């Protein structure tokens, strides 16, 4: 059985993001992490939307680039196969653009970074701050090297 990946947009999707490319990227990351039978969703939104979520669930009244909502529930599908409801990732397109400019990186690279970051959180990894010495962030950057040539954002 394979992973189930859903990509959606809070507003009209920008032409620069191809949901199929994003789904393929997520599928590759899950495969490389040996995560099977996962159900995962990714929602693209704006800063206002993610700020509301950040305030509601983390009591932080400001936008952020990515949020992960881990569900962690196992269930059986119609065929009796065990599946894992991993959870949801929310990415702000406003913060994506800001980060790419602020950190002087390609927007495609930053999008992959935010997606991988969300997946690692859904897989139980965490970090106490954003310093590059954090184990999760080191692992994230090592993992991203594998996808250096994979384009998911059309410029």
From Swiss-Prot:
Residues at which Zn(2+) binds: 117, 121, 127
Classification via Pfam families: YbeY
Enzyme class: hydrolase
Cellular component, GO annotation: cytoplasm
This enzyme's EC code(s): 3.1.-.-
Annotated GO biological process: rRNA processing
Cofactor, how bound (note): Binds 1 zinc ion.
Subcellular localization, as worded in the UniProt entry: Cytoplasm
InterPro entries, per the entry: MetalPrtase_cat_dom_sf_prd (IPR023091), YbeY (IPR002036), YbeY_CS (IPR020549)
NCBIfam families: rRNA maturation RNase YbeY (TIGR00043)
Family: Belongs to the endoribonuclease YbeY family.
Protein name: Endoribonuclease YbeY
């Amino acid at each position: 059985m394979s992973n189930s990946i859903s990509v959606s947009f809070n507003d009209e999707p920008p032409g620069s993001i191809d949901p199929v490319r994003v789904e393929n990227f997520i599928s590759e990351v899950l495969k490389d992490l040996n995560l099977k039978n996962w159900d995962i969703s990714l929602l693209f939104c704006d800063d206002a939307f993610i700020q509301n979520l950040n305030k509601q669930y983390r009591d932080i009244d400001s936008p952020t680039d990515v949020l992960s909502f881990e569900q962690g529930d196992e269930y059986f599908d119609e065929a009796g196969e065990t599946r894992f409801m991993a959870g949801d990732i929310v990415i702000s397109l406003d913060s994506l653009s800001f980060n790419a400019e602020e950190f002087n990186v390609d927007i495609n690279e930053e999008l992959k970074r935010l997606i991988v970051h969300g997946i690692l959180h859904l897989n139980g990894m965490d970090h106490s701050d954003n310093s590059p010495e954090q184990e999760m962030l080191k692992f994230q950057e090592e993992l991203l090297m594998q996808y250096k040539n994979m384009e998911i954002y059309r410029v």
